[in-house]
């Protein structure tokens, strides 16, 4: 089986359908003896340019190992699903399991925010003890 990176963008008004879509696509892949190495839901993001007069879309990234028949089926599903406004399927040489730069940046921001909150709380406690 080959490795693939799949990115699809969902209409922002259909964001509540994304978990169900991910479940269906994951079931199709695992049902054909495939494996999902990485699944990231990036959420709603600003588009670089308008697509069908839309400025935002819900992004989903999947790295999978699956037979070609399943990938063909997924591409057909993307093409005929009106909620999916764009999709891309790329073949990769190896399974990608590490977090994408999008998720890494989000985690770093979260860590900085938590560190700042902890420092602020420590400063407040130190100020209380001095009184």
Swiss-Prot record:
<comment type="similarity">
    <text>Belongs to the bacterial ribosomal protein bS6 family.</text>
</comment>
<protein>
    <recommendedName>
        <fullName>Small ribosomal subunit protein bS6</fullName>
    </recommendedName>
</protein>
<comment type="function">
    <text>Binds together with bS18 to 16S ribosomal RNA.</text>
</comment>
<feature type="compositionally biased region" description="Basic and acidic residues">
    <location>
        <begin position="104"/>
        <end position="116"/>
    </location>
</feature>
<dbReference type="GO" id="GO:0006412">
    <property type="term" value="P:translation"/>
</dbReference>
<dbReference type="InterPro" id="IPR020814">
    <property type="entry name" value="Ribosomal_S6_plastid/chlpt"/>
</dbReference>
<feature type="region of interest" description="Disordered">
    <location>
        <begin position="98"/>
        <end position="131"/>
    </location>
</feature>
<keyword id="KW-0694">RNA-binding</keyword>
<dbReference type="GO" id="GO:0022627">
    <property type="term" value="C:cytosolic small ribosomal subunit"/>
</dbReference>
<keyword id="KW-0687">Ribonucleoprotein</keyword>
<dbReference type="InterPro" id="IPR000529">
    <property type="entry name" value="Ribosomal_bS6"/>
</dbReference>
<dbReference type="InterPro" id="IPR020815">
    <property type="entry name" value="Ribosomal_bS6_CS"/>
</dbReference>
<dbReference type="InterPro" id="IPR014717">
    <property type="entry name" value="Transl_elong_EF1B/ribsomal_bS6"/>
</dbReference>
<feature type="compositionally biased region" description="Acidic residues">
    <location>
        <begin position="120"/>
        <end position="131"/>
    </location>
</feature>
<dbReference type="Pfam" id="PF01250">
    <property type="entry name" value="Ribosomal_S6"/>
</dbReference>
<keyword id="KW-0689">Ribosomal protein</keyword>
<dbReference type="GO" id="GO:0070181">
    <property type="term" value="F:small ribosomal subunit rRNA binding"/>
</dbReference>
<dbReference type="GO" id="GO:0003735">
    <property type="term" value="F:structural constituent of ribosome"/>
</dbReference>
<keyword id="KW-0699">rRNA-binding</keyword>
<dbReference type="InterPro" id="IPR035980">
    <property type="entry name" value="Ribosomal_bS6_sf"/>
</dbReference>
């Amino acid at each position: 089986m080959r490795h693939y990176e799949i990115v699809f963008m969902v209409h922002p008004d259909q964001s509540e359908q994304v978990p169900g879509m991910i479940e269906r696509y994951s079931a199709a892949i695992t049902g054909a003896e495939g494996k999902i190495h990485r699944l990231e839901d990036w959420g709603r993001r600003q588009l670089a340019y308008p697509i069908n007069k839309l400025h935002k879309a819900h992004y989903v990234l999947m790295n999978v190992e699956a037979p070609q028949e399943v990938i063909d089926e997924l591409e057909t599903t993307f093409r005929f699903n009106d909620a999916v406004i764009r999709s891309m399927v790329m073949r990769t040489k190896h399974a990608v399991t590490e977090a994408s730069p999008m998720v890494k940046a989000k985690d770093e921001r979260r860590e900085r925010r938590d560190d700042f909150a902890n420092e602020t709380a420590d400063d407040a406690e130190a100020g209380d003890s001095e009184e």
